[in-house]
Amino acid sequence: MKLVLAISLFLAAPLVARAPSIPAADAPQLAALGANPVGLQSTTVTVAGTARSLAVMVWYPALHGGTSTTYRRHLEPATGAALDITTDGIAVADATPAAGRFPLVVISHGFGGWAAGMTYLAENLASKGYVVASIDHADGQGGGGGSAGLVRVAGAIINRARDQQAVIAALSARAAAPNDTIGRHIDATNIAVIGYSMGGFGVVATGGAPYDKAAPSLSPLGGLLDDQTVRKTIPGLKAIVAIAPWGGQPPYRAWSEAGLRGLAVPSLFIAGDRDDVSIYADGIHWLYDHATASNRWLLTYREARHNVGGNPPPPETLTRPDLAENFAEPVWRSDRINAINQHFVTAFLDRFLKGDAAHGAFLDVPTVDSDVAQWPAAGPGFATSAQAGYWPGFQKRWLLGLELRHDAAR
């Protein structure tokens, strides 16, 4: 009877919330938080030549911990009632920054997203010695349907790369000011941009691939899509991460094959092979295949759709079928995707922004298909690069359903 009561109480107890930046026990090795506490400040950036003023959240390595942040967002979906959602964090508002300069990572969310929608990456990377700036692109809410929705989509297409480059320019300028509270901790010679969905659309252009303005999806925009705002080279930009990038798929294809060869910085593409928004084969994989001047990787989640870039579903959305498809995946656990992204993004950025060959070696997997990898050791633990046949950093029994392809620049 006591055992039955104990089990009943356990099952009835609420799960303790965990900040998305803290990986679960099944996470691969480099997903773990770094040694630094995390601070958080907010700033604004004005896009040159426009009236756009962007709110930007900046996470950074801090000297000390403290009361952690709870992120809040008011959602107004296209259908159903509005609601408020919360996400736990580990960052401490206005904490004193740690000494030194750190590489800059800019995060750009998907259409209708918000600056705190990818805190699983932002806080995690800041704990590892990066200054992370996440843009609120202010797309508005309510989806892309109807005339108002089409205006919002057009605005996102026009502004994504501009916004990213404006934030890079503003924070790089602050890095040159020795007394700037955040700028003096930014290493503007080592910059990466991470974009998810529509953010990925901008990232490919920011990385150096000019849009094909004659493309059917772009030609109606006319002179509004000014290539002069999409610079061919950005000082300090060393790498991009494109998560489920939009804009490669017909009929919305925004690049020519020749234009994609302008993407010359190292790139990490992340996608689900069942993506029904950006489309895997004719969209994301097509972008990857034709970015031939980039030293590039493609991480694929088999049986995953489009939601491979954001935080796990907020608890408040779990009983809302109209919201589930905006956050959750039908097969994969979202926190599992987050942890794998944390692992590989850390390996990639450490390799190209910090010159960390040891962490960079975690990209050198022995098999493209995770399912044919063989566990080389007798017991549990993380596989090392010295253990041939298994992806380094993954644990026994926890390597399934992935592909990691690499193609050198040519």
Task: Please report, for each region that a protein language model flagged, where it lies by residue.
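The feature captures the conserved acid-bearing segment of alpha/beta-hydrolase catalytic domains
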Residues: 96, 221-301
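Residue in the alpha/beta-hydrolase core beta-strand immediately N-terminal to the catalytic nucleophile
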Residues: 190-192
